[in-house]
Amino acid sequence: DLKALLIKAGYENVMTYIQSGNIVFKSSEASKKTLTKDIGEVIEKHYGFAVPLLILTGEEVEKIIKKNPYNDGKKDASKLHVTFLDSMPEKKLLETTRDEKFQSDEFYIDHTIIYLYCPDGYGMTKFSTMFFERKLAVTATTRNWKTLLELEKLATMKDE
């Protein structure tokens, strides 16, 4: 499995969450660019196909959690999601996308992070990963709020 593959590749304290490609690990390599390249090569060599990767430090995950404008205790946390963009979108695309509306759904773009609040559920929103990829011309991935909180817990455990 992926956990064993990364341990074999030399990564430490490897933990996975719900078999969805969410991994927490420790590495002496500080460059996220190098880590992305190296892990991408390990995965492609083993599985025979490339996958887009997004690597965040534990500190980045904590910051993302703290900055969520919808995590105010007034909104149902099960309706919160975060979309991660692989790069900063062009200003013009950001401006036109910010004006999009859909029912009572809300989103807030903070550089390469999009905070989503979907009161009717993520499955009912037009603000999907594909929507943002298409509108912003980037690669993206979305996680629900619970997953993000669990990844933060795993990252904290890793440091103990």
Can you say where each PLM-predicted feature lies in the sequence?
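Surface-exposed, charge/polar-rich loops and edge strands
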Residues: 1-20, 24-160
